[in-house]
Structures are given as C-alpha cells and as structure tokens.
Amino acid sequence: MKVLFLSFLLIIAAVSCSTVDEDCMCTEEYRFFLVTVVDTLGIPVDSLAITIKDKDGDELDVLQETHPFGAGKYTVLNDSFTQMFCACGTPEKIYFSATDGSRVANGEFMFNTDECKCHINKISGPDTLSLK
C-alpha cells in the first residue's frame, strides 16, 4: 500500500510539472513614453484633447496623467499595451494627435516589445510636437 501511495505521488508530481517555453523574467520597471506639445513660440501647452491610434486606426485608451516632468507632457504609450505587439520584435506604428480645438499637432511613432512582452520600446518618433 505504501509503495502504491508513493508511486501515485510521483506520478502526480511528474504530471504537475510543466516546461516553460521561454525563460522570461520581467522587472518591476513600468515604462511610459512622453511627447512634449508646444505652441508656435515653443511654449509647452497643457489641457489638449489627445487621440492615439494603432496601425489599424483603432483608438487606444492611453491614460493621460499629470506628469511631474513639466508642462505640455503627454503619454504616447506605456507598458499596459505590451500585449498588442508581436513578441517577434517587429515595430508597429502608433499615431498621436493633440488639439486645442483649432490647432493640431500630429506625430507618428514606432514601438515594439521584447520577446517576453514585459516592456515596450520606442524605436522612433519625435520628442516634441508643435501645434499648427
């Protein structure tokens, strides 16, 4: 009976083990990428209406928080969007638009993620946009 019980435990232990496809360990770092929007005089502008879209034109709900980094800073993308990217590292376009109702600032950005989908990476895109 004892041998049967131990055999049963060994079988359960072997079945419950799983193999991990990738060795992924994400850090607690939370990445977000900002853009500064300025007027024609180069003065940062707050309180703009922001629209962010993916490559298919679908609008992304990117939370815009007040940043301690100064006026006119807007979040383009953050780590909460890693799942929308391919783990293959292929960059995808993100379109950013800010308006005060009469003037518009537009920017195109390229982002990707790591193979574990832990963090986003900004591949290209402006740091500053001007309202025109």
Residue ranges and their predicted role:
Residues 41-47:
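A short beta-turn/strand-edge loop motif at beta-sheet boundaries
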Residues 17-32, 38-41, 120-132:
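Beta-strand-rich domain onsets/edges
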Residues 98-125:
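Structured interaction patches on ligand/partner-binding surfaces of diverse proteins
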Residues 42, 57-60, 103:
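Residue-level signal for glycine
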Residues 1-18:
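Sec-dependent bacterial lipoprotein signal peptides
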Residues 48-97:
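Tryptophan-paired
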